[in-house]
């Protein structure tokens, strides 16, 4: 009977081991609290640390890495002429696998200038190809380097060859940069996406569960990469990568390529050993170039509609400010938590004010909602003021500034590894948090429009959002 399959008691030991191995600390605590006997620490195999599955790799790939020589930046080559580049291209074709990386003038792949490309075909076998070094001074002497268009023409057969696997770390960025130079990189592997498919949500050996180059290098290779700030500086003293001396630029860029090569050698076998091949090969790897194309294509927005909404919001904000000042009995800076707290609890005398360590009253949303529920009209007005101010600054104004002057579209960046659920997340600008349940939020969403003859389709299946729209 069906009742025979009913789970009457949760088997504690295997569940506790599973929860601890995967970092579900809150659930593990609840499991301990629900037991009749005193809580005890789950004892795993002492020879196998917690989360060892993310570090001790089956299939011998860890051993393969151990057999490699340590990273030696002095072995890297700076490729400054066509003959040397031809040699590296020949080496990549012979290896049938090459790790690659691009260096650019900015983080925005849609507008950044290509400064250089690095390649790696094995341990200690890495190079940097400078393309646009020397700064923008027309009269300054430029370092010897291959002309950009000529270098792309030489590299294009390699980057587009089906006979050579190209490996990137966050390859989507590099695909977008090179696509703007007429090059479609394929086939590709992406070590960042591999790491996400294998270790999403895990905090490993105290290093953290991120999937960036520096974290992966330290976690899996025990290697500390050169930091970008150590190459380009920070603040007012920061320089563009194109002004970094070639010897230093070569160390930084070629290291990225070699680290990517080593990470691929480690992570690729884990996919098959740990059952991750199906998801990676059938879903996430094919999705990388698709999402890259989505970013390049961008989203059309109605600038006039946004400007109109922004003006309406500004008018409403000004009206609310006047009403709030009238209720307070004096003008003050509404956006200042300190001044707002003093008005609410000292001047107007509302009860329940609590001061934090800084000595000022808390005026977060929960406090204002409580006061609103108790009949404080000024709290209601401040909540409305905050909402409109945020919508105006975050969306109606910011989206207008985000419109690319060349394409006339907004080119957001979609992260494949930004959400543990597997959903895409959006940044620069963030498009996923635009309100949908309010009329104001819907007005902002209506500013996103389709090209003439097209429609925007929203797809949903059984209340589960699809990975790509």
Annotate the PLM regions.
Residues 180-181, 200, 216, 274, ...:
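Residue-level signal for well-ordered alpha-helical positions
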Residues 88, 145-163:
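Short, basic/hydrophobic alpha-helical segments
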Residues 184-200, 212-215:
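Conserved beta-strand -> loop -> alpha-helix junction used to position metal-binding or nucleic-acid-contacting
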Residues 99, 163-171, 456-458:
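Acidic beta-strand-to-loop metal/phosphate-binding motif
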Residues 1-141, 186, 204-208, 216, ...:
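Conserved "right-hand" nucleotidyltransferase catalytic core of DNA-directed polymerases
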Residues 173-180, 343, 468:
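Phosphate- and divalent-cation-binding pockets in alpha/beta enzyme and binding domains
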Residues 174-177, 212-216:
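Alpha-helical scaffold elements adjacent to nucleotide-binding pockets in ATP/GTP-utilizing enzyme cores
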Residues 81, 170-171, 191, 465:
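Helix N-cap/beta->alpha junction signal
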């Amino acid at each position: 009977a069906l009742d025979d399959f009913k789970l009457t008691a949760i088997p504690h030991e295997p569940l506790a081991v599973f929860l601890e191995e995967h970092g579900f600390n809150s659930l593990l605590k609840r499991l301990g609290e629900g037991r009749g006997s005193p809580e005890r620490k789950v004892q795993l195999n002492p020879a196998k640390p917690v989360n060892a599955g993310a570090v001790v790799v089956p299939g011998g790939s860890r051993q393969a890495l151990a057999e490699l020589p340590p990273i030696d930046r002095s072995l890297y080559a700076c490729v400054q002429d066509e003959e040397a580049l031809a040699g590296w291209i020949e080496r990549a074709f012979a290896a049938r696998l090459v790790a690659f990386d691009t260096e650019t003038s900015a983080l925005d792949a849609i507008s950044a200038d290509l400064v250089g490309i690095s390649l790696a075909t094995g341990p200690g076998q890495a190079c940097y190809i400078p393309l646009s070094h020397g700064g923008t001074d027309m009269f300054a002497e430029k370092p010897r380097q291959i002309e950009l268009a000529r270098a792309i023409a030489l590299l294009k057969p390699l980057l587009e060859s089906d006979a050579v696997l190209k490996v990137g770390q966050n390859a989507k960025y590099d695909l977008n940069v090179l696509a703007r130079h007429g090059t479609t990189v394929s086939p590709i592997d992406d070590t960042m996406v591999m790491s996400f498919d294998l270790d999403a949500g895990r905090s490993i050996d105290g290093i953290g569960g991120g999937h960036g180059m520096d974290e992966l290098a330290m976690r899996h290779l025990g290697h500390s990469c050169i930091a970008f700030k150590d190459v380009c500086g920070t603040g007012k003293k920061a320089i563009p990568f194109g002004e970094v001396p070639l010897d230093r630029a070569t160390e930084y860029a070629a290291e990225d390529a070699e680290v990517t090569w080593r990470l691929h050698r480690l992570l690729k076998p884990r996919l098959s050993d740990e059952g991750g091949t199906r998801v990676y090969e059938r879903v996430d790897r094919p999705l990388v170039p698709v999402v890259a194309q989505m970013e390049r294509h961008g989203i059309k927005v109605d600038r006039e509609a946004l400007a109109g909404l922004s003006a309406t919001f500004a008018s409403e904000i000004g009206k609310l400010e006047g009403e709030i000042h009238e209720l307070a009995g004096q003008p003050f800076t509404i956006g200042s938590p300190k001044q707002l707290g003093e008005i609410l609890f000292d001047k107007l005398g509302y009860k329940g004010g609590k001061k934090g360590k800084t000595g000022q009253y808390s005026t977060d949303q929960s406090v204002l909602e409580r006061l609103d529920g108790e009949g404080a009209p000024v709290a209601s007005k401040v909540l409305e003021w905050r909402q409109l101010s945020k919508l105006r600054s975050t969306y109606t104004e910011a989206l207008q500034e985000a419109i690319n002057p060349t394409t006339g579209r907004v080119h957001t960046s979609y992260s494949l590894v930004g959400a543990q659920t597997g959903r895409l997340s959006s940044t620069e600008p963030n498009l996923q948090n635009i309100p949908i349940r309010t009329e104001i939020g819907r007005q902002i969403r209506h500013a996103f429009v389709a090209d003439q003859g097209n429609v925007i389709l929203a797809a949903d299946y059984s209340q589960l959002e699809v990975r790509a729209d």
